[in-house]
């Protein structure tokens, strides 16, 4: 399943998101959701320990000035990769 987080993790039921993640799922951080990828925040460690791949939309990282502040565990992607993820996953959950 593809999960997309478009809101700030501080304004989302992040605990519920973590509970619903399963091995093989993928999470795309976009819009204000990219703030979850910033090194040192309280949500990042939970994401790093989850059995999933985490991506961040590069355009949103750039727009928020965060490109140099995310860990290597978070994979920056462009809109073409975003489309590939949506095609890959028949089911999706938006947060």
Curated annotation (Swiss-Prot):
Q: Which GO terms describe its cellular component?
A: sulfurtransferase complex
Q: Which UniProt keywords apply?
A: Cytoplasm, tRNA processing
State whether keyword Nucleus applies: no
Q: Where in the cell is it found?
A: Cytoplasm
Q: What disulfide bonds does the UniProt entry report for this chain?
A: none
- The main location class comes to cytoplasm
Query: What Pfam families would the database entry show?
Result: DsrH (PF04077)
Q: Which GO terms describe its biological process?
A: tRNA wobble position uridine thiolation
| Similarity annotation | Belongs to the DsrH/TusB family.
**Function (record text):** Part of a sulfur-relay system required for 2-thiolation of 5-methylaminomethyl-2-thiouridine (mnm(5)s(2)U) at tRNA wobble positions.
Query: What protein does this entry describe?
Result: Protein TusB
């Amino acid at each position: 399943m593809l999960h997309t987080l478009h809101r700030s993790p501080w304004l989302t039921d992040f605990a519920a998101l973590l509970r619903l993640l399963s091995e093989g799922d993928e999470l795309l951080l976009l819009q204000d959701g990219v703030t979850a990828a910033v090194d040192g925040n309280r949500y990042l460690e939970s994401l790093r320990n989850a059995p999933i791949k985490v991506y961040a939309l590069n355009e949103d990282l750039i727009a928020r000035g965060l490109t140099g502040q995310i860990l290597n565990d978070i994979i920056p992607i462009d809109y073409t990769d975003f489309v590939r993820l949506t095609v890959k996953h028949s089911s999706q959950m938006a947060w």
